[in-house]
C-alpha cells in the first residue's frame, strides 16, 4: 500500500511504470491469505475502485487462490474464476469487478486492442519467478497497458538471470518472509 500512496518521486515513477514490487514469502507461509489481506486493505484504505486480476500458471493454484477468496467471503468462485480467454476479455472490458481469477495461459492470443485501459487494475502474479515472461506475459501487458503489477513468489531465484527478470517486470522486493524468519 505504501508504494501506491508514496509521495517519493522514484517510487511514483516505479508505480507509474506498473511495477509495485515482489512479495517473497516462503512456501507454506500463507501467500494466498496475504493476497486477500493486501487486496482488501487496498480497497479499504486507498480506493474501492480497484480491480485485482490474480494470475497463476497452474489450475491447482488458480483453484486454491479463488477458493481462499471465496472461503473468506470476498468473491464467488463461480462468477469470478475465468474459464476462457474470451470470458477474460469480456470481464476486463466490462468495468469494475473487484476480483478476477485467471491463468496466464488465457493470454494466449495476440492482443490487437487492449482489454482495458483503466489505471486502477492491479495484476497479482503468483509464482512470479516463473511463466510471467515471454509471449503470454507480453500479451497480458498489452491487454492491460495501464495496469500495475505485483509479484508473489515462494521460490525466488537469487542472483540469477531469472531473478533480474522478475525485478525488471515487477520491481524490487517489498516484503520478505523467508524460511529463516518462518522457523524463528
Question: What residue spans do the PLM features occupy?
Answer:
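RecA-like P-loop NTPase motor core of helicase/translocase proteins
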Residues: 1-184
